[in-house]
Amino acid sequence: MNQVYNFSAGPAMLPAEVLRRAEQELCNWHGLGTSVMEISHRSKEFIAVAAEAEKDLRDLLAIPENYNVLFCHGGARGQFSALPQNLLGDKSTADYIVSGYWSECAAKEAEKYCTPNIIDIRSNTDGITSVKPMNEWALSSDAAYVHYCPNETIEGTAIFEEPDFGDDKIVIADYSSTILSAPIDVSRYGVIYAGAQKNIGPAGITVVIIREDLLGKAHKHIPSILDYTVQVKADSMYNTPPTFAWYLSGMVFKWLKEQGGLQEISKRNLAKAELLYRAIDNSNLYINRVALQNRSIMNVPFQLVNPALDGKFLEEAYAHGLHALKGHKVAGGARASIYNAMSYEGVKALVEFMADFERRNG
């Protein structure tokens, strides 16, 4: 079978080594004669899996001891609802930084529970998209927290600054598409959350990292499954968790440590992104419409100067083993998502195909 590279924005490709190991263990996990999918989440064997996954994640991100790590259901959209219900307390507003589609979705969901102060930081100059730096964010004095998304997958925009708004600001960040791609100073945040299906593991599990002092503030009518305090007390097993996704996520954490940790992964990711952006910028057929300082390392959207070639480009790319390059319906064009599991060789194969396609169609 020819090599296939999956550029999907999510669910995204998983490390080949992880998939091979999962295949080997699928029907007889640890000599039990059964799959890890079939054992009780309360068995000593699975509790060990869960504990090791948390330990490895803590090691990778250097998570301080005063933070709890949860493995939840519901994806990032579930957290859009959980956050205000857990953290508003007696306040009626929160700052929502809107930099793209997903942060706007979070703000819209928050409207069910409060009157969010929406701060739109998007800018467009001559067709080039950028986002305002943090020192230009007009934060309110009475907000329960500040919510933002460091990486917008659809627009391909990124915020590389880490927050420094003072100790009185509780910062919440949706790291779904960029977690584990580079080191993070977790201590700058009150809550970090991330859907698994991009850089953590398969769809079905969501990581929530929450500072201990933020627990115990949930609204009295919050569904128990969304209550962080309930989940902490239950070790993320208030109900049956997505055990296979948890197991595979733990294997990805182990793989990341084996690669040299997040410093090494960050170097690889930068090299992949630089290769692809250089190919786009040096071409006459492809264009990326994001300002240099805000270009995402994880998600690279690009358009063909002649949109009539979009279908042909995507069809031929697929035939060459370059899959899932179609841009989001909101943005159109093409998009290459180059998360941790995407190899440099995969990006090189895409760049070589793009050059060949331009020679034949430019």
Swiss-Prot record:
Subcellular location: Cytoplasm
GO BP term, pick one: L-serine biosynthetic process
GO CC list: cytoplasm
Enzyme Commission number(s): 2.6.1.52
Residue sites binding pyridoxal 5'-phosphate per the record: A76, R77, W102, T153, D174, Q197, N239, T240
InterPro entries: Aminotrans_V_dom (IPR000192), Aminotrans_V_PyrdxlP_BS (IPR020578), Pser_aminoTfrase (IPR022278), PyrdxlP-dep_Trfase (IPR015424), PyrdxlP-dep_Trfase_major (IPR015421), PyrdxlP-dep_Trfase_small (IPR015422)
Cofactor: pyridoxal 5'-phosphate
CDD domains given in the database record: PSAT_like
Pathway(s): Amino-acid biosynthesis; L-serine biosynthesis; L-serine from 3-phospho-D-glycerate: step 2/3; Cofactor biosynthesis; pyridoxine 5'-phosphate biosynthesis; pyridoxine 5'-phosphate from D-erythrose 4-phosphate: step 3/5
Enzymatic reactions: O-phospho-L-serine + 2-oxoglutarate = 3-phosphooxypyruvate + L-glutamate; 4-(phosphooxy)-L-threonine + 2-oxoglutarate = (R)-3-hydroxy-2-oxo-4-phosphooxybutanoate + L-glutamate
Record keyword Oxidoreductase present: no
GO molecular-function terms, A-Z: O-phospho-L-serine:2-oxoglutarate aminotransferase activity; pyridoxal phosphate binding
Keywords: Amino-acid biosynthesis, Aminotransferase, Cytoplasm, Pyridoxal phosphate, Pyridoxine biosynthesis, Serine biosynthesis, Transferase
Modified residues (N6-(pyridoxal phosphate)lysine): K198
Cofactor comment: Binds 1 pyridoxal phosphate per subunit.
UniProt xrefs under Gene3D superfamilies: Aspartate Aminotransferase, domain 1, Type I PLP-dependent aspartate aminotransferase-like (Major domain)
Residues reported to bind L-glutamate: R42
Function recorded in the entry: Catalyzes the reversible conversion of 3-phosphohydroxypyruvate to phosphoserine and of 3-hydroxy-2-oxo-4-phosphonooxybutanoate to phosphohydroxythreonine.
Family: Belongs to the class-V pyridoxal-phosphate-dependent aminotransferase family. SerC subfamily.
Subunit structure: Homodimer.
PANTHER family listed in its UniProt record: PHOSPHOSERINE AMINOTRANSFERASE
Record protein name field: Phosphoserine aminotransferase
Organism: Xenorhabdus nematophila (strain ATCC 19061 / DSM 3370 / CCUG 14189 / LMG 1036 / NCIMB 9965 / AN6)
